[in-house]
């Protein structure tokens, strides 16, 4: 198969073509004339020149480019591990349907003390006498795997054997420890189904990525996670002491060990939505409660916000409604970025666009951090000053109304309420975890003062 790559969504060529600013975080690559031809080929999806590997390896390592496709792995090289907590006939039927879609692959089902009996043909079934959690269930199955690759698949997702083999094909590059597809949510025409199809925490979007903490895609859910078995065992598999966030922890340990993790949204696997608003809010709370434990293992990686100081001041001015102040800081930010990026030789238009995108992105991230972490503080502060109240109101309403206008849900009022309350539930979980671990570090932002673009 001809090797081809696709540029990252953040890709800015220099005016003379002898450099590119790309990836997440942004990295600048200065290239020779030969390197410029390689960049041209990547942009046009043409055959790559010979001796491209030195440059393309550097681009791959920073997420500036991504593999365009992969060859399917052999079915004999993949074992599927399914952690299962079966509670009723419907969840058992879902498991049977999942296994039927994986015919041709070795399958291990680990029943984690399921209250409903698990009777499955076409798979090896292991039973835990006590409920040990999904991390332990996966590890029990992984310990039995003798193949090169292992696919961890949750029982409430739909995925085919062909999709898993395609994902495993990305592991032909031994630097890649794991790869995950896009996890979409089944829209069953109920309100919950519709809401989850728009705002599922498992759906990481449509843009491929090299996964790293504090980047555009900073983690992978273990809903469907295809791994190099040796790499997985080298880093110690899943941490069984974590009932939540064990997949995030595993990805971060891999990246800290120098291994690559890839997100491949071209492959989509639908996931069943929660059955009620109460279950949805409980899920968000649980996810939030994992932040403190993750921060304990990976200091500052679970921060609610990472931002450049100048961008942050501009974003704060916008959310406070201080338009005249915001205009000044927006102008200063654009001037600063245009000046600091002068060595990249990208056009002034691209530099201005980058600065503007940074302002917009930071404003969105600040609003998200306020709602998903700091809203109790802003609520208390609003009793003393009206500015925090303005920021809290903007952070709650602007994203929700924007989503209402963009998606046009069938239940607009309920959509607005659940959109706001789900974020507040996540924040409540973050605070609960911080109190439980007696550490506030997971509540603190990471503010940088230097240019975050590397060369």
PLM regions and their residue ranges:
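Conserved donor NDP-sugar-binding/catalytic core segment of glycosyltransferases
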Residues: 161-194, 272
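Short aromatic/hydrophobic "clamp" motif used to bind/position activated sugar donors
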Residues: 150
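Membrane-embedded multi-pass helical conduit in multi-pass membrane proteins
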Residues: 315-432
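Acidic, low-complexity/disordered tracts enriched in E/D and polar residues
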Residues: 1-41, 61
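Short, flexible, basic/aromatic active-site loop/helix in glycosyltransferases
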Residues: 181, 196-217
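Glycine-rich, basic loop-to-helix element that forms the pyrophosphate-binding segment
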Residues: 127-145, 207-218, 223, 253
């Amino acid at each position: 198969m001809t090797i081809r790559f696709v540029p990252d969504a953040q890709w800015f060529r220099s005016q003379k073509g002898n450099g590119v600013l790309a990836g997440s975080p942004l990295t600048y690559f200065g290239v020779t004339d030969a390197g410029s031809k390689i960049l041209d080929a990547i942009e046009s999806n043409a055959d790559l020149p010979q001796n491209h590997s030195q440059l393309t390896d550097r681009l791959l390592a920073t997420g500036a480019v991504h593999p365009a496709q992969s060859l399917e792995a052999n079915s004999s090289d993949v074992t599927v591990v399914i952690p299962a907590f079966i509670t009723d006939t419907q969840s058992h039927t879902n498991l049977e349907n999942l296994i039927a879609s994986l015919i041709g692959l070795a399958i291990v089902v680990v029943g984690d003390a399921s209250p409903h009996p698990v009777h499955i043909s076409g798979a090896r079934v292991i039973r835990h006498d006590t409920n040990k959690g999904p991390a332990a269930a996966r590890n029990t199955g992984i310990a039995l795997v003798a193949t090169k690759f292992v696919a961890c698949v949750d029982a409430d997702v739909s995925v085919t054997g062909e999709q898993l083999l395609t994902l495993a094909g990305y592991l032909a590059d031994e630097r890649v420890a794991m790869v995950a597809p896009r996890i979409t949510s089944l829209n069953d025409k109920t309100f919950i189904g519709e809401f989850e199809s728009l705002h599922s925490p498992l759906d990481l979007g449509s843009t491929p990525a090299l996964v790293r903490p504090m980047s555009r895609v900073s983690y992978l859910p273990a809903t469907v996670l295809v791994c190099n078995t040796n790499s997985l065992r080298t880093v110690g598999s899943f941490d069984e002491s974590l009932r939540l966030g064990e997949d995030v922890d595993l990805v971060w340990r891999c990246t800290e060990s120098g291994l690559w993790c890839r997100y491949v949204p071209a492959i989509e696997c639908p996931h069943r939505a929660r059955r009620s608003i109460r279950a949805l809010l409980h899920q968000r709370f649980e996810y939030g409660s994992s932040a403190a434990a993750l921060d304990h293992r990976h200091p500052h990686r679970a921060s609610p916000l990472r931002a450049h100081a100048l961008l942050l001041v501009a974003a704060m001015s916008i959310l406070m409604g201080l338009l005249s102040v915001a205009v000044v800081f927006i102008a200063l930010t654009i001037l600063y970025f245009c000046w600091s990026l002068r060595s990249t030789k990208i056009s002034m238009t691209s530099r201005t666009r980058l600065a503007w995108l940074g302002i917009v992105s930071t404003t969105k991230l600040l609003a998200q951090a306020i709602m998903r972490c700091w809203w109790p503080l802003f609520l208390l502060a609003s009793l003393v000053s009206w500015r925090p109240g303005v920021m809290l109101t903007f952070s709650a309403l602007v994203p929700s109304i924007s989503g209402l206008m963009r998606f046009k849900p069938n239940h607009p009022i309920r959509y607005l309420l659940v959109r706001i309350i789900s974020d507040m539930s996540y924040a409540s979980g973050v605070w609960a975890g911080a109190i439980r671990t007696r550490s506030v570090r997971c509540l603190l932002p990471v503010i940088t003062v230097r240019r975050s673009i590397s060369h």
